[in-house]
């Protein structure tokens, strides 16, 4: 059930429209469910929120009892940055590996399959891929999360990745 914040409370309403709060644990806390019911439009999930695909599906269903159109966001890049397989490591190649192979059809298919798995669990927004160009090989944050150092390669693979996610119904 969606109950928007009071019409006169524009600050709260505006905040609920743009924030994507996270939380600790594998079930949604009462404060989060209350805010989703009041109009919070999105929730961000991380590895600490996921024990298994089945548990994740139950969590997203729990959120949707308060608001059926809530965006459930996650950072699922494959490779070193995984949430679905956080306990054992990703079975999918990361962006740097995909860029090294430089096959956009493969990148699209990997992203489509990741998107399919996310959608099965009720996740409808992926914060991936990292569209950064790895212009500094010593950058500890981007590194293997980038498709590579070439701007055109990174652009091609970013577009293919987004197409794959969207084909699975994930933004």
What are these regions (language model features)?
Residues 37-59, 63-157:
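Enzymes and membrane/adaptor proteins characterized by extended Gly/Ser/Thr/Asp/Glu-rich
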Residues 157, 162-171:
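Phosphate/pyrophosphate-binding betaalpha-module
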Residues 8, 29-30, 103, 139, ...:
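Short, structured coil/loop segments at alpha-helix boundaries
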Residues 15-16, 67-69, 123, 167-170:
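Short coil/turn connectors at secondary-structure junctions
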Residues 2-58, 80-82:
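DNA-contacting surface of Y-family translesion DNA polymerases
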């Amino acid at each position: 059930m969606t109950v928007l914040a009071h019409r006169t409370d524009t600050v709260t309403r505006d905040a609920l429209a743009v924030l994507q709060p996270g939380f600790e644990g594998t079930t949604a806390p009462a404060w989060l469910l209350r805010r989703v019911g009041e109009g919070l439009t999105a929730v961000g999930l991380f590895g600490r929120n996921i024990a298994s695909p089945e548990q994740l599906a139950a969590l997203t269903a729990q959120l949707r009892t308060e608001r059926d159109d809530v965006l459930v966001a996650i950072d699922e890049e494959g490779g070193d940055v995984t949430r679905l397989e956080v306990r054992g490591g990703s079975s999918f190649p990361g962006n740097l590996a995909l860029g090294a192979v430089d096959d956009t059809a493969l990148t699209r298919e990997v992203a489509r399959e990741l998107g399919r798995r996310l959608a099965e669990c009720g996740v409808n927004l992926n914060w991936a891929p990292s569209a950064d160009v790895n212009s500094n090989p010593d950058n500890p944050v981007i590194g293997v999360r980038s498709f590579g150092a070439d701007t055109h390669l990174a652009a091609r693979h970013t577009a293919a990745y987004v197409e794959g996610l969207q084909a699975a119904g994930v933004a």
